[in-house]
């Protein structure tokens, strides 16, 4: 009787579904669509750059009003712009603005004072164009985080609106923060935050866990206003406690899914992207004494499988093939052992 050979093809899904790597920060946001002046409109708020590296002398700031029906940007608009702390509702900067062109443009210089430098209309609106942007010194963008930009459209083409609409937007600016961890030697890591500053980094050598603490308001009404919380770790591959082991991601000690990208030559990038629904669910799960912060945790797990393409199937060994981001594993073995005739 011929020996019956079975080729067993084992597919191991490591991370829920295949996901692409997420980009850095928003830096750009569009409002909800509102109907006024016989058309549907939305407002776009944008900054340049979208991620801070700590050496920026000024930040580009641009506001555009888009006619959603005609899909074009509207010119000759007067605004009331109010930039607010989204957690407490306090106004940081408020001013009247005007652009004869398609977009209102300003340069914001991060300082602990408020000062405007530019031209005004006869109606005392600050003018900002691409060729001559308004310069504003203000306590804004001194670090990465979330700001609320409320844009009230007062007039279009010199015609005042009887009931000026207010567009509310939440704008996220990222920031790269370098830090060090010492285990057997000193390692240089990077953390990217797209929501708020980081109060503390800590590595627990006994538990082999890395954490970053970020202030956060877990009030459910506030959480429902934000689309998601985004953060990233950049870990050198020389750090074997994470490179040679599987990585478990946690938020306030609750295990969550995320993206772990090992495709780079020198570093591992771990992405936290927590949407609104997950944040609301986490509110009921996290320890009550952590309702004032988010703790982004990485735990070193079991030794991970590595690519193995020189195995002998006939001797009962297995071939292991990994996808680029290692979110899919393919294990190939023969049962029973022996040659394929």
Task: Name the predicted role of every residue range.
Residues 7-16:
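Bacterial N-terminal signal peptides
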Residues 22-233, 237-341:
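N-terminal soluble domains immediately following signal/targeting peptides that reside
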Residues 1-7:
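Bacterial N-terminal signal peptides that target proteins for export
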Residues 1, 15, 331-333:
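A detector of low-complexity, intrinsically disordered, Ser/Thr/Gly/Pro/Ala-rich segments
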Residues 16-22:
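N-terminal signal peptide
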């Amino acid at each position: 009787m011929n020996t019956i050979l079975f080729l067993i093809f084992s597919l191991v899904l490591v991370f829920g579904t295949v996901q692409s790597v997420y980009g850095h920060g928003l830096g750009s946001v569009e409002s909800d669509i509102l109907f006024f002046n016989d058309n549907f409109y939305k407002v776009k708020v944008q900054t340049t750059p979208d991620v801070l590296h700590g050496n920026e002398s000024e930040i580009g700031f641009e506001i555009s009003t888009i006619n959603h029906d005609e899909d074009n940007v509207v010119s000759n608009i007067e605004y009331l712009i109010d930039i607010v702390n989204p957690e407490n509702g306090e106004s940081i900067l408020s001013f009247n603005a005007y652009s004869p062109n398609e977009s209102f443009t300003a340069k914001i210089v991060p300082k602990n004072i408020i000062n405007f430098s530019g031209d005004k209309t006869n109606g005392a609106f600050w003018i900002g164009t691409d060729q001559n942007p308004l310069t504003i010194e203000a306590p804004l963008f001194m670090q990465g985080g979330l700001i609320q930009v409320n844009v009230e459209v007062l007039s279009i083409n010199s015609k005042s609106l009887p009931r000026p609409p207010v567009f509310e937007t939440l704008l996220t600016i990222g920031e790269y923060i370098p830090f060090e961890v010492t285990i057997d030697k000193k390692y240089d890591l990077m953390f990217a935050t797209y929501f708020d500053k980081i109060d503390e980094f800590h590595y627990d050598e006994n538990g082999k866990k890395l954490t970053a603490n970020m202030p956060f308001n877990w009030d459910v009404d506030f959480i429902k206003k934000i689309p998601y919380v985004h953060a990233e770790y950049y870990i050198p591959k020389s750090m074997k406690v994470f490179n040679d082991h599987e990585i478990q991601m946690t938020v306030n000690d609750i295990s969550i899914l995320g993206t772990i990208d090992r495709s780079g030559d020198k570093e591992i990038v771990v992405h936290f992207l927590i949407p609104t629904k997950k944040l609301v669910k986490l509110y009921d799960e996290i320890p009550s004494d952590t309702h004032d912060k988010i703790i982004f945790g990485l735990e070193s797990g079991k030794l991970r499988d590595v690519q193995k393409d020189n195995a002998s199937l006939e001797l009962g060994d297995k071939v292991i093939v990994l996808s680029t981001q290692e979110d899919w594993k393919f294990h190939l073995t023969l049962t029973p052992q022996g040659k394929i005739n």
